A protein has these predicted regions:
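Short beta-strand to alpha-helix junction loop
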Residues: 76-84, 211-237, 243-246
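Conserved FAD-binding subdomain of flavin-dependent enzymes
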Residues: 57-105
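A conserved short coil-to-beta-strand element within the FAD-binding core of flavoproteins
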Residues: 245-274
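Glycine-rich FAD pyrophosphate-binding loop
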Residues: 23-61
Length: 324
């Protein structure tokens, strides 16, 4: 049976992109696409972005916050890597620049405000450090090369391996300019996954030789919610897509089948965060369900000026749902 309707669990970039392509390439009606999400900021993960912002944001006196400031991470755009994203943004209009697509808006702004950082590293008493000298020794280079050139079918060797464990024979790398710049650019720690480091090395390999200036980084005109997410939201709303907010999907119902690899969703259970109630949504045979099985912010926590962010070892909402 040909599917005619779609349910999107979460309103993150991946699901919104899927909706755009269903409409433009699949000739679907927007009214047949429904998003169930906490808010229009992301996936089926933790508390809403607005809750955190309101708690930390003193709108009347921004510099008088007593808790701290939230600087959420963004996508570090690189045209040579983000080909699919730029294709997506070329399909939707900018919300601030009349007559431009969202991609043209970004290219126009970026061409006039090129990235060229003059001070990636600072050292007390010395000022700017020459980041051009990466500081890698031969063993660092060998281990990095092995990581980058590892075939995909061997990546499972890195299951549950931290970056510190991978480089245990050469901890020197963590005292190099390369590591200081790479970890702060891509939010890595030595406890992070070696698999994730390998994938980032593949994705952002162009930045390896220019990381001291980040000249390959392309920037949006405004923050990425306003320059990427908002154009998507406005376009999809204009196409008639349904956004059901304040919902966190907590469980799937599956059709009984003798086929191990045949997965058919027949229902969804979700929390109405606003009302504190549980809701059920039936899924018929004409509907396909899209779910992003993880989120980089899934188990994120926040600290403040006086308290470090607590460590959360529990599975986040998206990961817990995927495990079911």
């Amino acid at each position: 049976m040909r599917k005619k309707k779609a349910i999107m669990i979460g309103a993150g970039l991946a699901n919104m992109a899927g909706a755009v392509y269903l409409i433009q390439e699949g000739n679907w009606d927007g009214k047949d696409i429904t998003f169930y999400a906490l808010d229009t900021h992301g996936a089926n993960d933790g508390s809403t972005a607005s809750e955190a912002a309101e708690e930390y944001w003193n709108k009347n006196h921004p510099m008088e916050n007593t808790k701290g400031f939230i600087a959420r991470g963004g996508r570090m755009l690189n045209y040579r890597t983000y080909v699919d994203l730029m294709d997506l943004l070329d399909r939707i209009p900018s919300v601030t620049e009349p007559g431009m697509t969202a991609a043209e808006d970004t290219r126009d702004f970026d061409s006039k405000h090129r990235t060229y950082d003059k001070a990636r590293l600072l050292q007390g008493g010395k000022g700017i450090v020459d980041g051009h000298k990466l500081g890698l020794n031969n063993l660092d280079r060998i281990l990095l090369s092995r990581l980058v050139m590892m075939p995909d079918n061997q990546e499972e060797k890195l299951d549950n391996v931290t970056i510190a464990e991978y480089f245990e024979d050469s901890p020197h790398i963590f005292q190099t300019n390369f590591w200081y710049m790479w970890e702060t650019t891509f939010a890595f720690r030595t406890q992070s996954s070696a698999q994730e480091l390998r994938r980032y090395m593949h994705q952002m390999i162009y930045e390896f030789t220019q990381i001291e200036h980040l000249v390959g980084v392309n920037r949006t005109r405004y923050n990425q919610y306003e320059s990427i997410m908002l154009p998507l939201i406005k376009y999809l709303e204009g196409q008639g897509c349904n956004f059901v907010m304040n919902r966190r999907v907590t469980d799937f119902e599956f059709k009984d089948t003798p086929m191990q690899d045949e997965i058919t969703v027949t229902g969804l259970e979700m929390e109405n965060i606003e009302q504190g109630t549980v809701e059920h949504v039936a899924v018929d045979d004409e509907t396909v369900v899209f779910f992003t099985n993880g989120s980089i912010t899934d188990s994120a926590t926040l600290g403040d000026f006086n308290t470090p962010a607590p460590e959360n070892m529990d599975y986040g909402a998206a990961s817990s749902l995927w495990k079911k």
